Amino acid sequence: MDPFHNGNKRSSISFGSSQRQPYNKNNYLSGTNGPSSAAQDQGRGPSPFGMSGNTTNGGNSKRNSGCDLSATYYASRSPMYSPLDFSPPVFSPNHSQLQQARGYAANIPVVSNLMNPSMASVCEYQSHYPLFGLDWSADDYVCLGSYKEDSRNKLQVLHSNDLLSWESVVDADVVYPVSKIQWVPSQLYPRKLATCSDSLRIWSVSPEERQFQEQINLSLCKYNRQHPANPAAADDMKVIGTFPPITSFDWNTVDTNLIISSSIDTTCIVWDLQSSHYVKTQLIAHDSEVFDVRFLTKSTQLFASCGGDGSVRVFDLRSLAHSTIIYEPPSSSVSGATAGTITPSSKGSDALLRLEPSPYDPNVLATFAADSNKIIILDMRNPESPILNLQGHGSSVNGIKWHPTKRNVLLSCGDDCQVLYWDLNSSFMEINAAGSKSPSIHGTSLEDPDGDTEMTDGGAGSGLNEDPLSLNNNSKQVCKTLETPNMMYANKTQEINNIAWRPQRGDWFGCVSGKKFQNVRVL
């Protein structure tokens, strides 16, 4: 969602303004006759964050009904993350959801569908609030974050013993909707999670004692360090509302004292929770807003970011004077921008919204752009050009997650009310057969046949060969497009805003749409 562009398209990932536009590609859930009716937000609506740090949520919106039945529609929007749209999904009036799914993808197994509950196991929890934020812990606690236009948002923790019913065990009030939630990796006790919105916060969670408390506001600590003569209190929203909002963050899985965050002010910050100053380093990462940042797999030194300039960049904390651009949009519109100058991404831009490094091959990353139904698979051994494009969604992609235990399996969700399951191993085998450097289909990188990842960051295996920022760009290859997923899950009523795998085994995934959280067994 883009907290800095007023707008009322609240589904998927934007605070941005919304316009209905023809989208010609067939999707699994819409017939050729188009939708029968729609209630789509067209006006300019409130934004949780003002450009100048205003914390008020003023604004009006209007609704228009009716649509042209000659085409399928999707909603265009500017980047970042905003979850909610209560308008009906784009379905043909003459076919059921399941029929349409089978009609457009007869060979795709349905993971589960609420119209036929016997096909698979689905459990749902109905919240009182529209939902966007989502993460699943190792001991089956799920944290949900609301998205409301006023200043009364919630964090809610659910728990289930059998994954067939969920109980709300504790919640906390927040002012602004969170754009990301993450439980601390590989740690059950004490339970902690982080969230980002106006600030980056660490929370302490004790369901047994019914306690959910903010432990530290890292953005506020940074501010008070810079203003020792006039520090701000934890509840001083007049000050906190002026901070550059945090668009995303990532908790390092090797050293959980390290967190990296991205912001709309073009910077990324590496935080050290053991340091008295908390800020380890801050750098200008892009020429415009930075929308996501992630540590590369098994590394404490290497990280990648994406942003409004449409590029993916790789950094090494040991040498921040240089970075490597591993992907740029085919026609870059930001070539004239100066580093450190904020260039807000415009509607229809190539802004990349989310980045997902593979948990098994640190050379491989997935990303997607604003207003796009395409997922881009990148390999740092073949920079600048994607190795694979996934175009199975019928509307804009909202989220992507690699499977936690299965190699080269990706989950995606979108405005077409679908979750798609992609097994990319066969596609990578075809790339391998073509003789290009490409992702491994086994347990290690292709350039590491003995199973040993090279050590490039002081003991943590990064999996990158030699200098990770000295990439070989000699072998160009034609990017393959994959349009048919292996499995799909169709939500009957609303766009799917976010997804998360059950981290232990990946036998279930969770998704949020509207006010509903669902967990679905993957057969």
Curated annotation (Swiss-Prot):
Composition-biased stretches, type Polar residues, lie in 9-40
This chain's source organism reads: Saccharomyces cerevisiae (strain ATCC 204508 / S288c)
Say yes or no: keyword Kinase present. no
Its main subcellular localisation, reduced to a broad class, is cytoplasm
List the InterPro entries: DCAF7-like, WD40/YVTN_repeat-like_dom_sf, WD40_repeat_dom_sf, WD40_rpt
Query: Where is this protein found?
Result: Cytoplasm; Nucleus
Family (UniProt): Belongs to the WD repeat WDR68 family.
Q: Which UniProt keywords apply?
A: Cytoplasm, Nucleus, Phosphoprotein, Repeat, WD repeat
Q: Which superkingdom heads the taxonomic lineage of this protein's source?
A: Eukaryota
- Chain spans, region Disordered: 1-64, 436-472
Q: What else is known?
A: Present with 799 molecules/cell in log phase SD medium.
Which stretches are tagged as biased composition: Low complexity? 52-64
User: What Pfam families does the annotation carry?
Assistant: WD40
Q: Which residues carry this modification: Phosphoserine?
A: 47, 65
Q: PROSITE patterns of this UniProt entry?
A: WD_REPEATS_1, WD_REPEATS_2, WD_REPEATS_REGION
Question: What is this protein identified as?
Answer: WD repeat-containing protein YPL247C
- Which Gene3D superfamilies does UniProt cross-reference here? YVTN repeat-like/Quinoprotein amine dehydrogenase (2.130.10.10)
The ranges of the WD repeats are 173-213, 241-281, 285-325, 392-432
Tell me a GO cellular component: nucleus
